[in-house]
Swiss-Prot record:
Gene transcribed to yield this protein: proA
SUPFAM superfamilies: ALDH-like
Lineage: Bacteria, Bacillati, Bacillota, Bacilli, Lactobacillales
Pfam families named in the record: Aldedh
Name of the molecule in the record: Gamma-glutamyl phosphate reductase
Its biological purpose: Catalyzes the NADPH-dependent reduction of L-glutamate 5-phosphate into L-glutamate 5-semialdehyde and phosphate. The product spontaneously undergoes cyclization to form 1-pyrroline-5-carboxylate.
Length: 414
């Protein structure tokens, strides 16, 4: 095991022990100072980001969009920290309490997870969001970003650590692994003595690599092969507005819609309308045989398309015979992130919500709302697509666990 990595783990554990005892007022004051220091040092961050962007000129636009940092995005990061400071602190919160037949008082209390490892790709905002959420919830964080964002992440973490140091707070609450090799990532995934949970942030390949390699417990997040189903009873104007929003507003993010399913009864009427609306925004459509017959500019779909998260202005279209056919298709190909039905029939809408096996299931709303901020959680550390511990947008509450505190007055078990 890499000795530098072990040293990082030990420092993180030590910081986590201190953070677990830190009061809410101190944490909130620190977060506000972190936000101010990001703004104060924005030129340093942008200069570092320019180095990363210069090395990524051959990468697709969807990649550089996630990588790019400017004054507005730094302001957004800072505002995210301020929002977290305003949120309720779940640590030390008592979920419930009771007295047993033997007179023992039992309290179920929220406590931090400990040390959280984040493995992520080219999203510098993750560095700041993760630091804010882990710090407020009393956890230390070890960050390992992709090589494409190494200069930006290094600058961000340097500023965050210097801010903590100036406040006489544990600087090792946030640490960055600057070795971006796969070998060090694999060792991090197995640092069970020091890391309590791993959260991968990125595409499906990264997430699956972490899930299959790690011996540290993993919260699986966010690949988003998201679907919108237009029911036979849908308001077609609403359906058009929601579909365009879900696909076009920000196609590179995990809650953007990638697939459009349309009930056969309305396909001839609706598909030409939605195809025109999407194509006006530069969306390339790929469809099944029926879709291609209805709109000649739609390209034939392949089996691989149904399983693909495009993160781009591409959308696959399928015509289905029934609500159950739509549900079956979605449950087979979905990454269990976010799906939506557009319908005026509330019974069919509720049935869809119950039958779909995804973290977030909408009726008559865009999948783009799957977001910690939109849910009222503040910034999120990721969107969990698994069922154990946390599911959906993960805010402060999801970064804690429970502890039972039992108080007696001399009881012994008979």
């Amino acid at each position: 095991m890499n000795q530098d990595l072990i040293a990082i783990g030990k420092r993180a554990q030590n910081a986590a022990n201190k953070l677990a005892l830190m009061n809410t007022a101190t944490k909130n004051k620190a977060l506000l100072q972190l936000a101010d220091d990001l703004i104060k040092n924005k030129n340093q961050i942008i200069a570092a980001n320019q180095q990363d962007l210069a090395a990524a000129t051959q990468m697709p636009t969807k990649f550089t969009d996630r990588l790019m940092v400017n004054s507005q995005r730094i302001a957004d990061m800072a505002n995210g920290l301020r929002t977290i400071a305003d949120l309720n602190d779940p640590t030390s919160q008592i979920d419930k309490g009771w007295i047993t037949k033997d007179g023992l008082q039992i309290l179920q209390r929220r406590v931090p997870l400990g040390v959280i490892g984040i493995i992520f790709e080219a999203r510098p905002n993750v560095t700041v969001d993760a630091t804010g959420l882990t710090f407020k919830s009393g956890n230390a964080v070890i960050l390992r970003g992709g090589k494409e964002a190494i200069q930006t992440n290094t600058a961000l973490v340097k500023i965050l650590r210097e801010s903590l140091q100036s406040q006489h707070l544990p600087v090792d609450a946030v640490q960055l692994i600057t070795d971006t090799s796969h070998a060090i990532a694999d060792e991090m995934m197995n640092l069970t003595d020091y890391i309590d949970v791993l959260i991968p942030r990125g595409g499906r390949a990264l997430i699956q690599r972490v899930v299959t390699t790690a011996t540290v417990p993993v919260i699986e997040t966010g690949a988003g092969n998201c679907h919108i189903y237009i029911d036979k009873d849908a308001d077609l104007t609403m359906a058009t507005n929601i579909t365009v929003n879900a696909k076009v507003q920000r196609p590179s993010v995990c809650n953007a819609a990638e697939k459009l399913l349309i009930h056969r009864d309305i396909a001839a009427k609706f598909l030409p309308v939605i195809a025109k609306a999407l194509m006006e925004h530069g969306v390339q459509l790929r469809g099944d045989e029926t879709a291609c017959q209805l709109v000649s500019t739609i390209r034939p779909v392949t089996e691989e398309d149904w399983d693909t998260e495009y993160n781009d202005l591409i959308m696959a279209v399928k015509i289905v015979d029934s609500l159950d056919d739509a549900i079956s298709h979605i449950n087979h190909y979905s990454t269990h992130h976010s799906e939506s039905i557009i319908t005026n029939n509330i019974t069919r809408g509720r049935y869809f919500q119950q039958a779909i096996n995804s973290a977030c299931v909408y009726v008559n709303a865009s999948t783009r709302f799957t977001d910690g901020g939109e849910f009222g959680f503040g910034a999120e550390i990721g969107i969990s697509t698994q069922k154990l511990h946390a599911r959906g947008p993960m805010g402060l509450q999801q970064l804690t666990t429970i502890k039972y505190e039992i108080t007696g007055n001399g009881q012994i078990r008979k």
